[in-house]
Amino acid sequence: MSSEVRWKICWENELEASDHAELADFFCKTYGPTGAFNAKPFETGRSWGGARPERRAIAYDSHGVASHMGLLRRFIKVGTTDLLVAELGLYGVRPDLEGLGIAHSVRAMFPILRELSVPFAFGTVRHAMRNHMERYCRDGTANIMTGLRVRSTLPDAHSDLPATRTEDVLVLVVPVDRPMTEWPAGSLIERNGSEL
């Protein structure tokens, strides 16, 4: 599958309005089937749902956007330890390409992780994605962690809602410049911002 797509690795500032429109359409079509609310942030042409990524890996094929992964460097707190990570998020594969191996092509982001000199990449996924993530992690490149809660700020302020939410999600950790044994202990991760 990776030979049929071309990858564009770019900084957020390199995207044009037309790129954001195409990505917003991609996210509506990709996230919409998982629940109408999941596509809502993208209905206005915005190509991000919470925090805005600084780098993106976008795969294109003859039908447009095929896959996407966003990256944002940030400090999170794991237990009592502040930790610089590259948060990975805004992951999607066009529905007609699911199951064809394109997820493994997201490894196009790995050289960027090394270039940014972050100790770890970090991301979260729903428990419903566990089987998919286990297949992805089978080669030991990434690790799935369970039993962790992640607290994030809401992307928008609402007077009738709390400012943060705490979720029980699967945590994906990719050792980049440090071994997995150096990931801090702790059952709560403070994202200190909105989910990517």
UniProtKB/Swiss-Prot annotation:
Alphabetical list of PROSITE patterns matching this protein? NODA
The record's annotation in InterPro entries points to:
NodA, Nodulation_prot_NodA_CS
Any Pfam family: NodA
One GO molecular-function entry: acyltransferase activity
Q: Which UniProt keywords apply?
A: Acyltransferase, Cytoplasm, Nodulation, Plasmid, Transferase
Query: What is the protein's major site of localization?
Result: cytoplasm
Domain of life of the organism encoding this protein: Bacteria
| Family under the similarity heading | Belongs to the NodA family.
Q: HAMAP family, per this entry?
A: NodA
* Protein's job: N-acyltransferase required for nodulation. Acts in the production of a small, heat-stable compound (Nod) that stimulates mitosis in various plant protoplasts.
What name appears for this protein in its UniProt entry? Answer: Nodulation protein A
Q: What is the lineage of its organism?
A: Bacteria, Pseudomonadati, Pseudomonadota, Alphaproteobacteria, Hyphomicrobiales
Gene this protein is translated from: nodA
